[in-house]
């Protein structure tokens, strides 16, 4: 927490350990980097609607964020690529997100933002509750000149976002000042629906480039391994839920 040397009035606990329907407090702004790549303990998923239950932490937090936002409340949420392309419950959550909120911007971050803790590629989702999504703007955040990857001693800096800030515009007028360029492109909700809510949409202005740099190749390898591990956990979650449902059916 920037500038807070001695935090007070902070409660330690699991925010998800409470039925979703019991949240009465509503908030105007949420800025969060929820845990991702992990799963919750058995029973936590029961706090969520039966058709939206999962043990994957990031998916549960995204549902909670949508629930507790006020009408016209705004959120900025860091989520992994797996949320963008994931299916099953993830598809249902993304459908709900675009129907209940205006998911107006997704900033696609480069590899290594959270090095050395994780190499999973991440994104920042910006949305406002109370209006359906019509179009989603994507912005691909590039590495600064001369940088091939981030690390603990050379992390991402706020100054790198100056180009996004200049391009951002005003939500009040529907971001009419935004223009597509080599880093930014717009996708309609109709295209998103046709893709079954797969939001892993690549930059159409950037041709695929063959990479030979060893550091970049190694970073990509680690990212892919972590994404595989996340998908493996998701598959275990799906199979566990299916087996539990089957057991309950046999018991009846």
Model-predicted segments: where are they?
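Short, conserved SAM-binding/catalytic segment
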Residues: 1-6
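A conserved structural/catalytic subdomain of Rossmann-like adenosyl-cofactor enzymes
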Residues: 12, 17-252
């Amino acid at each position: 927490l920037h500038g807070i040397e001695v935090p007070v009035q902070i409660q330690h606990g699991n925010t998800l350990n409470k039925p979703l329907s019991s949240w009465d407090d509503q908030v105007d702004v949420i800025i969060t980097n929820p845990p991702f790549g992990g799963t919750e303990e058995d029973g936590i998923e029961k706090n969520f609607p039966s058709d939206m239950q999962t043990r994957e932490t990031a998916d549960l937090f995204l549902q909670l964020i949508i629930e507790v936002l006020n009408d016209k409340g705004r959120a900025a949420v860091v989520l992994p690529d797996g949320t963008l392309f994931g299916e099953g419950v993830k598809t249902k959550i993304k459908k709900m997100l675009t129907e209940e909120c205006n998911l107006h911007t997704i900033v696609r971050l480069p590899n290594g933002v959270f090095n050395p803790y994780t190499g999973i590629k991440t994104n920042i989702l910006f949305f406002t509750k109370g209006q359906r999504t019509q179009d989603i703007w994507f912005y691909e955040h590039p590495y600064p000149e001369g940088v091939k990857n981030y690390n603990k001693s050379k992390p991402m800096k706020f100054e790198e976002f100056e180009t996004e800030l200049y391009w951002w515009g005003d939500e009040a007028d529907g971001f009419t000042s935004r223009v597509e360029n080599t880093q930014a492109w717009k996708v309609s909700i109709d295209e998103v629906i046709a893709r079954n809510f797969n939001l892993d949409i690549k930059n159409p202005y950037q041709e695929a480039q063959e990479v030979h740099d060893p550091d970049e190749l190694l970073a990509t390898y680690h990212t892919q391994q972590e994404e595989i591990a996340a998908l493996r956990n998701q598959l275990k979650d799906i199979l566990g839920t299916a087996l539990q449902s089957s057991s309950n059916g046999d018991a009846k």
